[in-house]
Amino acid sequence: MNSTRCILALLLCLTQAMSGCYGQGSLIEEIENLKEYFNSSSLDVGKGGDLLFNILMSWQKDGDTKIIESQIVSFYFKLFEALKGNQAIQRSIDTIKADLFVKFFNSSMEKLNDFVKLTKIPVNDPQVQRKAVNELLSVMPHLSPKLSLRKRKRSRCCFGGGNRPVKNNLASTI
């Protein structure tokens, strides 16, 4: 039960950090409800340091947050699935899931369904393994960072848009 408390305490930190939800009263209330339910304000919750927050912060330094955010969101969806039958906190979980849906999936049900579908693929199934390896060569190029093939053109004149004389060109100075 202590690990569950720790996880939900970090849920508060992570959700606030990811969504900037300081002005969203109902979301904060629901997170506070979960904290109270799991007694996550207890001193033993902090033992061993943060579970997810430090990892997220270290990835933000590099600017590659989408990868780790998707793993963290996946973690929370699994956590919420494990807590699904608990009626005392179901409304809080639904509110937080709705906020994640808007912020992480841009309110796209298709993206949410694809995400959930990916998290439920049984990786121990030999048929799934064969299909995944077969598709690997096609998938890998889409996973690498995109290099900008087009370079931005620079303006030939100064900020004001006026004509600027070219150095060492007598015709432009006359």
From Swiss-Prot:
GO biological process, alphabetically ordered: adaptive immune response; defense response to virus; humoral immune response
Subcellular location: Secreted
GO MF annotation list: cytokine activity; type II interferon receptor binding
Tissue: Released primarily from activated T lymphocytes.
Residues carrying a glycan: 39, 106
UniProt KW keywords: Antiviral defense, Cytokine, Glycoprotein, Growth regulation, Pyrrolidone carboxylic acid, Secreted, Signal
Residues the record lists as Pyrrolidone carboxylic acid modifications: 24
Signal peptide as annotated in the record: 1-23
CC terms in the record's Gene Ontology section: extracellular space
Family in the record: Belongs to the type II (or gamma) interferon family.
Assembly with partners or alone: Homodimer. Interacts with IFNGR1 (via extracellular domain); this interaction promotes IFNGR1 dimerization.
Function: Type II interferon produced by immune cells such as T-cells and NK cells that plays crucial roles in antimicrobial, antiviral, and antitumor responses by activating effector immune cells and enhancing antigen presentation. Primarily signals through the JAK-STAT pathway after interaction with its receptor IFNGR1 to affect gene regulation. Upon IFNG binding, IFNGR1 intracellular domain opens out to allow association of downstream signaling components JAK2, JAK1 and STAT1, leading to STAT1 activation, nuclear translocation and transcription of IFNG-regulated genes.
Protein name: Interferon gamma
GN (gene name): IFNG
